[in-house]
């Protein structure tokens, strides 16, 4: 399970520590916290210029599992290397060589390196979306929208075609669209009729009636 959650401030201007409190509560309840990813928003929402603190440009993404036996396909989320060569004495050597002149190199994977837990420029360069820019959809007016490319690696890395993806806060339908575009099904819950309509519009009537359930 991937959980994207931001923080908020109390009346004193202190962070409520919502993400940290929630993650601790879930671990206490039996969930296994695999990663705490940091989503760096390249186009963060502008803040009041009168605030007496730094502006916020990130949210936490928690990766939870319920057991030690879970599906994860690293090859779907690898990040291509920036160069075909790595530096090392006594001379430069190809990254796909295991040994060169007695010096051990990293055992580089042909599909790329393991992604980092800081998501910003990385997500632009994954093997899934080399040519796509990491920017939010500004045409959708929703308080908690996120880019399709943010969640695409999560879906492809932790599910296979034909699996059903659950989004209990469907919103504008980003999860549903990415799921459908990549051969998955989707079940979503949304209390706002406006955003249910938006989800239908984004996914297409034929696709959503067959492969998406909105409740």
What are these regions (language model features)?
Residues 200-215:
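S-adenosyl-L-methionine
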Residues 1-203:
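Core catalytic lobe of class I
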